[in-house]
């Protein structure tokens, strides 16, 4: 207050005012500050005093031929004075107005194409709806967000190559456009920008916006997809928020969302297969999202989500070094620990072997709807500060932290046996057992934890075992805060290893992620996800399994046919028949299988009973482990459309309908493909396959005795010759091969040779 009085006093003296307004600044430090370097030190001030001058703009001399000296009001538009230090002329801001109103109009066709991201933003805002403004405390946490809607996902280097190729195609320099997306974009942009007059530099800047993901670490309280971030300044302040619904979607958000759904589906499916890692890789490589290969998206897309990270790790890509537990991302901010196995007893006297973290550590925990700071020592929670959207989210965070602390009172709070299993029916590890148990019901845990009186600290309150807030008492070590905990900002990625069961470890051997951490949330993908792998057939329900299984047999009929006769066991074990088994009633699966296998054996033995359509139809039923029984079936039941439908062993049905004339197969009314083979190839194919390992020498030769049946051939010694009865009663002379190595070619050549021998 004193200072202000003093200043007022000084200002009232005319001499003070004069000194401040008239004296030159001659203090060297000040002159240095404002004159060194090219960087403008006070842009706003500079702009103000520049615009107060009459001619603050410089322009190329040619402008004097294109703009009159005075406008309609008689105001001067440019000065005859040259700009000091360049051969440009000084121009008034009024000249800009004149040019905008009366200047030449160029072709504007390229503008929407170049400034695409801006035009699209205007459209989104035009069609978006802004709702009411609410005043409330905003729990914002800094997250890494995408600030640039509508971009492709190229790396900076890839984008640079595309931009150079589009904007400066004749410049020298090695540019290698390899990825599919690079080539597509380059072609598209070159066509769009033919005869474009906009300055190349501007075009390059705008292309960069379109091709590269730009992220910033910003405080966010609501949606984090880029169409929300672009209006962040309109939707949330320090104490207010405004409801907003975007007026359009952008592909990059859709890719992120669909990638997460595809990754979750794939990890869940892989976890229950015999070799999870191999299955996961097979599925990632055969899946497309919005027409782009999933593996390409994984390489470029920085989305961090548990399932996505598991897929990335499997492909050998680096991922974030933070670890996941109970759906929260943990990042150690200080301290260290060593791990040691320890046996503990639950409240139900069940023994658990847990890996105890010995030592003092601090973590940040970030979830979708709650965040926390956790300080812990060996098997002891020291402090937990939680903030969250609602009571439910806060409770989730507290449970995860209490389990993670490995405190004895948590383990003693277990009631009943722990026997949770994952999707593959394997027991979960002890930490996840405990987590699942308390996620189901945490009452005993909270009651047993204990409470303590609390000090009044700004911005913090206590929370009682029944989840009600309090300013006097709180559960031991637990406090609720108004402020959120920021997400880990670093984009550092580390090399990790992944085992067969999809557990991911860092180089010190700490588990960062496992399939148990993958969310069970189901969603509908925005872009079409095409899973080509048979493992994913069941994702669209039983009908899709049925159609896909038969489509697969028809597409691969040539190889299936040979295996059917040569090595049926290998064929029955093919993974493509796995999903089909879930459609066959469990009680009868084995009998169906035994029945079909016997039927197939008869077809192999008795020539002429081979029936392509019937083999295709019954083949999936033979894949189950067979039970021997005398039962005969005229039809099989499959569980589709909510009830059992029947497939006839002989003949067509609505489930399986093969049209002999057109060779088209329809399954449940859906087209399942066309069989491509010659009518006589049907039997010849099988016989040629059966004759693998035999060389067909020509027509029957009586010197080698009476014709044998195909089954009797197996008794021949290597190099021995014999006549053999094939097909429609024809006899040919064969010799058993001396070497096995050439067997593969036999089945292809046999068909031709049989024909030559007979004719």
UniProtKB/Swiss-Prot annotation:
Keywords carried by this UniProt record: Cap snatching, Eukaryotic host gene expression shutoff by virus, Eukaryotic host transcription shutoff by virus, Host gene expression shutoff by virus, Host mitochondrion, Host nucleus, Host-virus interaction, Inhibition of host innate immune response by virus, Inhibition of host MAVS by virus, Inhibition of host RLR pathway by virus, Inhibition of host RNA polymerase II by virus, mRNA capping, mRNA processing, Viral immunoevasion, Viral transcription, Virion
Gene Ontology CC terms, in alphabetical order: extracellular region; host cell mitochondrion; host cell nucleus; virion component
Site note Mammalian adaptation, residues: 627
Motif (Nuclear localization signal): 736-739
SUPFAM superfamilies: PB2 C-terminal domain-like
Compartments where found: Virion; Host nucleus; Host mitochondrion
Main localization of the protein described in the UniProt heading: virion
GO molecular function terms attached to this record: RNA binding; RNA-directed RNA polymerase activity
GO BP term, pick one: symbiont-mediated suppression of host mRNA transcription via inhibition of RNA polymerase II activity
Pfam families: Flu_PB2_1st, Flu_PB2_2nd, Flu_PB2_3rd, Flu_PB2_4th, Flu_PB2_5th, Flu_PB2_6th, Flu_PB2_7th
Role according to the record: Plays an essential role in transcription initiation and cap-stealing mechanism, in which cellular capped pre-mRNAs are used to generate primers for viral transcription. Recognizes and binds the 7-methylguanosine-containing cap of the target pre-RNA which is subsequently cleaved after 10-13 nucleotides by the viral protein PA. Plays a role in the initiation of the viral genome replication and modulates the activity of the ribonucleoprotein (RNP) complex.
HAMAP family per UniProt: INV_PB2
Subunit architecture: Influenza RNA polymerase is composed of three subunits: PB1, PB2 and PA. Interacts (via N-terminus) with PB1 (via C-terminus). Interacts with nucleoprotein NP (via N-terminus). Interacts (via N-terminus) with host MAVS (via N-terminus); this interaction inhibits host innate immune response.
Protein family (similarity comment): Belongs to the influenza viruses PB2 family.
Protein name, UniProt field: Polymerase basic protein 2
Organism: Influenza A virus (strain A/Puerto Rico/8/1934 H1N1)
């Amino acid at each position: 207050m004193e200072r202000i009085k003093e200043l007022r006093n000084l200002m009232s003296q005319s001499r003070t005012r004069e000194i401040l307004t008239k004296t030159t600044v001659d203090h060297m430090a000040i002159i240095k500050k404002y004159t060194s370097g090219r960087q403008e030190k006070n842009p706003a001030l500079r702009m103000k005093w520049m615009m107060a001058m009459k001619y603050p703009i410089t322009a190329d001399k040619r402008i004097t031929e294109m703009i009159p000296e005075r406008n309609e009001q008689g105001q001067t538009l440019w000065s005859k004075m040259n700009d000091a230090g360049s051969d440009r002329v000084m121009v008034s801001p009024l000249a800009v107005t004149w040019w905008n109103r009366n200047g030449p109009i160029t072709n504007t066709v390229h503008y929407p194409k170049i400034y695409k991201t801006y035009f699209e933003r205007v459209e989104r805002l035009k069609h978006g709806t802004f709702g009411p403004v609410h005043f409330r405390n905003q729990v914002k946490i800094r997250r890494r967000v995408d600030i640039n809607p509508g971009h492709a996902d190229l790396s900076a280097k890839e984008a640079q190559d595309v931009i150079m190729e589009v904007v400066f195609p004749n410049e020298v320099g090695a540019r290698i456009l390899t990825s599919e997306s690079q080539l597509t974009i380059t072609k598209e942009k070159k066509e769009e920008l033919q005869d474009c007059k906009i300055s190349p530099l501007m075009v390059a800047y705008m292309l960069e916006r379109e091709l590269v993901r730009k992220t910033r670490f910003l405080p966010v309280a609501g949606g984090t997809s880029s169409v929300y971030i672009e209006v962040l300044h309109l939707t949330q302040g320090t104490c207010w928020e405004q409801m907003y619904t975007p007026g359009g979607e952008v592909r990059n958000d859709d890719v992120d969302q669909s990638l997460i759904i595809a990754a979750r589906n794939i990890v869940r499916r892989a976890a229950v297969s015999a070799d999870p890692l191999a299955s996961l890789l097979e599925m990632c490589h055969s899946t497309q999202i919005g027409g782009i290969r999933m593996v390409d998206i994984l390489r470029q897309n920085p989305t961090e989500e548990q399932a996505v990270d598991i897929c990335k790790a499997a492909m050998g890509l680096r991922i974030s070094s933070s670890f996941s537990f109970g759906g929260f991302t943990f990042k150690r901010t200080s301290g260290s620990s060593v791990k040691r196995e320890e046996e503990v007893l639950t409240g139900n006297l069940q023994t658990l072997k847990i890996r105890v973290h010995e030592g003092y550590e601090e973590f940040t925990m970030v979830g979708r709807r709650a965040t926390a700071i956790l300080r812990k020592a060996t098997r002891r929670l020291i402090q937990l500060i939680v903030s969250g959207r609602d009571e439910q989210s806060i409770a989730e965070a507290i449970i995860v932290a209490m389990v993670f602390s490995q405190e004895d009172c948590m383990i003693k709070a277990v009631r009943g046996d722990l026997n949770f299993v994952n999707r593959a029916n394997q027991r979960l590890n002890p930490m996840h057992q405990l987590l699942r148990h308390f996620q189901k019901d945490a009452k005993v845990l909270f009651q047993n934890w204990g409470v303590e009186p609390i000090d009044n600290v700004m911005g913090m309150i206590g929370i009682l075992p029944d989840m009600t807030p309090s300013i006097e008492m709180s559960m031991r070590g637990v406090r609720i805060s108004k402020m959120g905990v920021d997400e880990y900002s670093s984009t550092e990625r580390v090399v990790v290893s992944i085992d067969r069961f999809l557990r991911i470890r860092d180089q010190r051997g700490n588990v960062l992620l496992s399939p148990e951490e993958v969310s069970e949330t189901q969603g509908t993908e925005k872009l079409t996800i095409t899973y080509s792998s048979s493992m994913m057939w069941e994702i669209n329900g039983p009908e899709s399994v049925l159609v896909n299984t038969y489509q697969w047999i028809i597409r691969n009929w040539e190889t299936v046919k040979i295996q059917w006769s040569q090595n049926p066991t290998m064929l029955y074990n093919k993974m493509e028949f796995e999903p089909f088994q879930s459609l066959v009633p469990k009680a009868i699966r084995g009998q169906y299988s035994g029945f079909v296998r016997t039927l197939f054996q008869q077809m192999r033995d008795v020539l002429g009973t081979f029936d392509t359509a019937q083999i295709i139809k019954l083949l999936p039923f033979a894949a189950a482990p067979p039970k021997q029984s005398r039962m005969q079936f005229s039809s099989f039941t499959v569980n589709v459309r909510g009830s059992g439908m029947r497939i006839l062993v002989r003949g067509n049905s609505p489930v399986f309908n093969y049209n002999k004339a057109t060779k088209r197969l329809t399954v449940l009314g859906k087209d399942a493909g066309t069989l491509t083979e010659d009518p006589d190839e049907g039997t010849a194919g099988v016989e040629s396959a059966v004759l693998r390992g035999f060389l067909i020498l020509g027509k029957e030769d009586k010197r080698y005795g009476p014709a044998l049946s195909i089954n009797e051939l197996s008794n021949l010694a290597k190099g021995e010759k014999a006549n053999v009865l094939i097909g429609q009663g024809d006899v040919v002379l064969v010799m058993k091969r001396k070497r096995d190595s050439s067997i593969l070619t036999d089945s292809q050549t046999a068909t031709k040779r049989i024909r030559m021998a007979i004719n």
